[in-house]
UniProtKB/Swiss-Prot annotation:
This is Toxin NvePTx1. One of its GO terms (cellular component) is extracellular region. In unfertilized eggs and early post-fertilization stages, is expressed uniformly. In gastrulae, the expression becomes spatially-localized and seems to be absent from the oral and aboral poles. In planulae, the expression is clearly observed in the ectoderm in packed gland cells absent from the two body poles, and upon metamorphosis, the expression diminishes. There is two types of gland cells, one large and elongated and another small and round. This toxin is maternally deposited at both protein and RNA levels. Neurotoxin that is probably only defensive. Acts as a voltage-gated potassium channel (Kv) inhibitor. In vivo, induces a rapid increase in swimming speed on zebrafish larvae, as well as death which occurs between 2 and 18 hours later. Coiled coil: none annotated. Keywords: Cleavage on pair of basic residues, Disulfide bond, Ion channel impairing toxin, Nematocyst, Neurotoxin, Potassium channel impairing toxin, Secreted, Signal, Toxin, Voltage-gated potassium channel impairing toxin. The keyword Transport does not apply. It is found in: Secreted; Nematocyst. It comes from Nematostella vectensis. GO terms for molecular function: potassium channel regulator activity; toxin activity. Belongs to the sea anemone type 5 potassium channel toxin family.
Length: 84
């Protein structure tokens, strides 16, 4: 039959594998792709969250401008113009 030492080694190896598996799952969850919400900086539309406002407008990566000029960076905002 199996010796006590062999059973102990098997138990330790199994424990190490289970610990590594749970650590990898936690790491994968933290590296999950995150999206940017309203008014957060972005560089492309794909970085903005896939959410819609009350008028069913999607978040887009846009440069905000007013009479004084435009901002130097883009933000995720709901586009008020026509969308297809």
């Amino acid at each position: 039959m199996f010796s006590a030492r062999l059973v102990l080694v098997f138990a330790v190896v199994l424990c190490i594998q289970l610990c590594n598996a749970s650590w990898l799952d936690e790491r994968a969850m933290t590296q999950e792709k995150r999206c940017n919400g309203k008014y957060q900086k972005c560089t492309s539309n794909s970085q903005c969250c896939d959410q819609k406002d009350y008028a069913k407008r999607k978040l887009r990566c846009l440069t905000q401008c007013d009479e004084g000029g435009c901002m130097k960076y883009k933000q995720c905002m709901f586009y008020a113009g026509t969308q297809k």
